[in-house]
A protein has these predicted regions:
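Acidic, proline/glycine-enriched N-terminal capping motif
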Residues: 1-68, 76, 212
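Short, charge-rich binding segments
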Residues: 58-62, 70-76, 82-92, 114-115, ...
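Short secondary-structure transition/capping motifs
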Residues: 37-41, 59, 72, 83, ...
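Conserved, structured C-terminal
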Residues: 1-3, 8-11, 17, 86-349
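Internal amphipathic helical hairpin motif
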Residues: 43-79, 140-170
Length: 349
């Protein structure tokens, strides 16, 4: 167990490699109850929330979700999050659910409340008495269909619905989302139902997975970790998340002027994928070199159990961000050859 954002979290259960391969080949489950979950209710909650994110939330409808980011005034990323459109409550009110990172949960919640409550929205912390579980892997959806008796094949990526699972007291908020690069679902449910479901899944032989496998899986899929691969000093264009910025929409949002300027001038750095020669692993903050001169910094790195190669994410100048570019990473005082590659490193065939 290790401390993480005020929680005690398991690094591994049976072993990182075994857990990683279980998710890639079959199915693994994660307790992700450390994540923050907020429900916003009131008149037109998507329009109100739009002022905080650069992605056009009106592109999604009830039962759909959008990955996006919260920004500061300089266009830096406060956090990344998923916004779930939960549709209408009645003729005058709608609801959205947002899932935020554990390390940012307190500051995000205060910041969102400060801006949403004056707009007439009620902000409720759903973590009180609730848990989040993630089922990830090619067998995740078939297993949920067995447990619920429902056909989930039509639930699209980033789709969500309430699902009644056998043995649980209440229907479960079920979203086809995840942080592994595999198919799967994330479930929001009551604490007592969470314990029941976790125990039942263990009895069925589902592999429990810890933070170690969660990190190697997300890194193979080139999914960002907030605080490492992006932070308040990084804008979406630098982080390879420019596709989240919809400057064509008329709505104003925090950080828009700064992002308009960056879109016109180009980013000062770019996040790239690196594959390293040999077995040496690049870690956070290791220097990236070009012709022996430091030009960038590694943000995340690991040994890929799937590819059996050392991989990393790093920021480098735009001129050096082209796939195929030869660079090196300084590891324990020695320059290890590395090549810029396209992200993600792994994508399910």
């Amino acid at each position: 167990m290790v401390p993480f954002a005020g929680w005690e979290m398991p690094v591994q259960f049976s072993g990182l490699i075994q857990e990683h391969k279980a998710v890639r080949e079959r199915l693994g489950m994660f307790d992700i109850s450390h994540m923050g979950v907020l429900r916003l209710e009131g008149p037109d909650p998507k329009t109100a929330l739009q002022q905080l994110v650069p992605s056009d939330l009106h592109r999604i409808g009830p039962g759909e979700a959008s990955y996006t980011v919260l920004l500061n005034e300089s266009g830096g990323i406060r956090d990344d999050l998923i916004v779930y459109d939960c549709g209408s409550i009645d003729a005058e009110r709608g609801a959205v659910v947002v899932v935020i990172n554990a390390a940012c949960a307190d500051s995000d919640t205060a910041w969102i409340r400060e801006r949403m409550e004056p707009a007439g929205l009620t902000v409720t912390d759903l973590k009180n008495g609730g848990v989040l579980l993630a089922l990830q892997g090619p067998e995740a959806i078939p297993l949920l269909e067995q447990l619920s008796g429902e056909d989930l094949s039509g639930l699209p990526r980033f789709g969500h619905r309430m699902v009644s699972i056998s043995g649980l007291r209440e229907p479960v908020f079920t979203a086809r989302t995840g942080y592994t690069g595999e198919d799967g679902a994330e479930l929001l449910l009551r604490a007592e139902d969470g314990q029941t479901l976790w125990t039942h899944l263990l009895d069925r032989g589902v592999t429990p997975c810890g933070l170690g496998a969660r990190d190697t899986l997300r890194l193979e899929a080139a999914m960002h970790l907030y605080g490492q691969d992006m932070d308040s000093g990084t804008n979406p264009f630098e982080a390879g998340l420019g596709w989240l910025v919809h400057l064509e929409m008329p709505a104003d949002f925090v950080g828009r002027p700064a992002l308009e300027q960056t879109a016109a001038s180009g980013p000062a750095k770019r996040l790239v994928g690196l594959k390293l020669q040999g077995r040496a692993i690049a870690r956070h903050d290791y220097p990236v070199l070009h012709d022996g001169i430091r030009v960038g910094t590694v943000t995340s790195g690991t040994w890929s159990p799937t590819l059996e190669e050392a991989i990393a994410l790093a920021y480098v100048p735009p001129a050096l961000a082209r796939p195929g570019k030869d660079l090196s990473v300084e590891i324990r005082g020695k320059a290890q050859p590395a090549t810029v590659v396209r992200r993600p490193f792994y994508k399910r065939p």
